[in-house]
Amino acid sequence: MTEHNHNHDVELDISNEEELLTLFDENGNEVLYRKMLEFYHPEFKKEYVILAEEGAQSDDDDMIELIPMINEPDESGDGGKLVPIETDEEWDMIEEVVNTNMEE
């Protein structure tokens, strides 16, 4: 079994500035999402965004579903496209970042 050695002392540039994004679901319907968190991780050399569907409500038993994505900038460095998370290591890192930052 391999051990994942994450550098927990890595300084992340984290933005909590909320922004609304319109994305399309698998049926081509527009869905409005709120960007909850955005950060660059130097170990993976990628920028990540954490989204939540706008208007989604949580109750005592259920939490709002957060959707992590990789933000790949275009050639000019602006905008870009959102792509799915690629590895288990990235999922583990994102879970740790989200848990740490959403508690604050």
Curated annotation (Swiss-Prot):
Disulfide bonds: none annotated. It holds the Pfam family DUF1292. Belongs to the UPF0473 family. This is UPF0473 protein SH1304. It comes from Staphylococcus haemolyticus (strain JCSC1435).
